[in-house]
Every structure is written in structure tokens, then in C-alpha cells.
């Protein structure tokens, strides 16, 4: 069964096609249209749908967490710019920002009724305000919701990057209030520990120092910098996978 990837950036969309061809993420189709142009009928026949797909890390993380490609799920990493610290320079338009696209995604959720949805947002006070609105919308359609703020450092990364992950499950009947937000430590997750070598490489990459990471001439280094651009907007796969595992266990046993 095919997966659907919606990604408006042509560069990231080509990454998706390459990763699909290489078998690193679920096989499927890449749609470069704006989510605002996607209609429910366009999603018929797809088992998994990934919106704001980036370079497909949600699909990779699902596999890492043991979630089979044939198992239905939707994911979405809605643009964080309206609610991030960086938005200060633009006076934080928030819900009035044209990049606040959850309402558009929600329209598709309401029409298509996926069983499970995963998403994430910046782990800040503004992110929590955003989440309140998201859960109000989802609960109005009888989704049970839960969320946690996790740190990439707890999943082995060499940076903090707190992110707000959430899950919505339509299998329960009746409207139910969402679970309290928790800060979850992932440090105990031994399978996802990073080596010191990997941490050192990541430190250098984040500092913009490619000299110790790359071999070759300047053109080859330029290519690697383009690759880093794709990574820059991606979620942390291990961080997401641990949340998926925990959410799946909760949905299975409760």
C-alpha cells in the first residue's frame, strides 16, 4: 500500500523521491502542491499520509519504532515559524500568520477520519498555546489526545531542541479531554544512544565547520551544505521514534 507525501519545497520533494527509491522510507507518491490545494479525494487509497513531509523523517521514525508501512497513520509537522522564538523579529503573527496551516490540515482530518495522527511543534509557551487550539479542534471530532515535551539530547543528540510531540487517536468513543503535557526524559532509552564520534560530527556541523567532516574539493563541500539544508528543517528521528513507541504502547494497552 502506498504512502502519500505532501511537500511544497521542490528540493525536499526530490529528497523524498530519492529516499523512496532507495527504500529508506515507505514507498509512495510525492505531491508538491500546497496543502491548501489538496482535497480529501486526493488521499483515497493511501495507507499513510505525511503532510509538511520535509525529507520524510516521520516515515523513517515510524519504521524505527516498529510501525509497519502497511499500518495506517497520518503525520504532520506544521510550520513552526508563527510560534517560534525566531518569530520575534516579525512580531509573532501567531494564529494570524499565513503559515499557520493546522486549520487546513484539520479540514482533511475531519473529512478523511484517519485512525491515528502524530504531529509536533516547537516546545515553547507559544507552542503550548498552539497545542491547546489543536486539541480543541481534534477533540471536537472525538479524538483522544496526548502530548509530551521531549528533548533531542535525551535521544542522544548533542543539542537540546525541545519539541512538543502529540498523538490523536480516533478509536475511542465520545469526547475525552487530552492528557496533561509532560516533560519526558529519553536518556534511559539505551538503543538510541549516540556515540561520541557522532556527537562530535554533529557539533561541528551545527557550528558550520565542515573542514573535519568532509573530504574533497569546494564543489563537493557545497553539495554537503545543500544536504545539511535538508537536515536543518527535519525532526530528530530517534526523538520521534521514542515518542511513537510510547504512544503506541499507551494506545494498545489502554
Which ranges hold each PLM region?
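Conserved active-site and SAM-binding loop architecture
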Residues: 1-254
